[in-house]
Amino acid sequence: MCKNPIELSGLATSCSSKSGKKCTTRNQVVALSSDLRNKTKKRICDTSDIKLTEDPFEVVNHPDIDVVLELIGGFGLAKELIETAIRNGKHIITANKALIGNHGNELIKLANKKEVRFLFEASVAGGIPIIKALEQGLSANNIESVAGIINGTGNFILTDMKEKGRDFDDVLKEAQALGYAEEDPTFDIEGIDAAHKLSILAAIAFGTKIQFDKVYTKGISDITTEDILHATELGYTIKHLGIAKRVENGIELRVHPTLVSNKQLIAQVDGVMNAVMVKSDALGTSLYYGPGAGDEATASAVIADLNDIINNQTSNHTLGWKSQQKINVIDNDSINSEFFLRLLVSDVKGVLSKVTGIFNDHNVSIEALIQKQVDENKNAHIAITTDRVSTKTVMSIKAAIEASEFNQADVQIIHIELLD
């Protein structure tokens, strides 16, 4: 059992939660140190039994501290604090997915060298918890694929657009007002946050290094109400998915908007909730659902990791990197998928024949085609789904359509994922 104090970098989230308040009693923590920018500021939780300091290095260098909880976020200070703490022989618990996605390999290597624990359940969909499921619950399985909704902000936006027919910008403003999206929402709406998380899940699932830089990443900022209406008519829901999949010559790592059949359970996951589907050789397909962010979800995962250390559990999030297999990441152009395309074309005689002719020229079969009524500008809205084809081929089709005399707007392309 950990008998020495625990250092908490970043106080508000964990201390204000129910799980965080249980920390000192359930786990017999002797004391809790927290670095704060202003230790005289009024807090939303009781800090009377907590030793406060404005200098985080005072605590990571303190000889009587066993465990460091890093909850401040970012790359610079957080990385320096964690490196210092590890070198001083302290166990690490963090919720910092961006830091792990960009620097996790070197930090894990350092933790292994110093023989300390480096745990980060809260970094990905903290309320599920998916990392322990992959490492422990599915340890008898070979993981074939991981696919999920791992950013609650994006899921909230897409859900509201579908349910209320609102446009993207309008829902984004509401998400910011509700605190679901940051003032600068780039990480959430452009898929960067989800890509950080996917790179972590893939490394654990497949026993590789973290490869955030190789994740194909596309956000939801260009999804329109027209896309959602067409998808609904075709029997699909648009979800922003992170997908890691074993294929014959490597693994696919991709984050992008995806049409998912309404028959799939994951299509029913709405609002800020997260869900991850895992396909494995023994168990088959399993679904893990729960809140991915917020005070309680983060604190629940952080305190669970703390329990593991205090109770001397053998699980360690560094296990997935021991083999560090060299697995090729498939280039996005080579990935095969079914696709949805939305076109805006002039309503002239023979236009449908010209459109389908472009698909025929590329040897691509059309699975479904919907033409909506002509708008006030005498343009026709067309939605098409294809059979399985490479991304490179469908991008060539897009280029050919956009170069035609009848095209009136950029062609929208969205993956269709069967998740079978």
Map each language-model feature to its residues:
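Substrate-binding/catalytic subdomain of NAD(P)-dependent oxidoreductase enzymes
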Residues: 170-268, 273-275
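A conserved regulatory-domain signal marking ACT and ACT-like small-molecule sensing domains
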Residues: 306-420
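Rossmann-like NAD(P)H-binding beta-loop-alpha module
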Residues: 112-193, 200
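A short hydrophobic/small-residue beta-strand
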Residues: 91-93, 366
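N-terminal glycine-/serine-/threonine-rich beta1-alpha1-beta2 phosphate-ribose binding loop
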Residues: 1-87
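Generic hydrophobic/aromatic pocket-lining and core-packing "Φ" positions
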Residues: 56, 82-86, 108, 228, ...
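Rossmann-fold NAD(P)-binding glycine/threonine-rich loop
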Residues: 72-88, 95-136
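ATP-dependent carboxylate/acyl-activation modules
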Residues: 264-334, 338
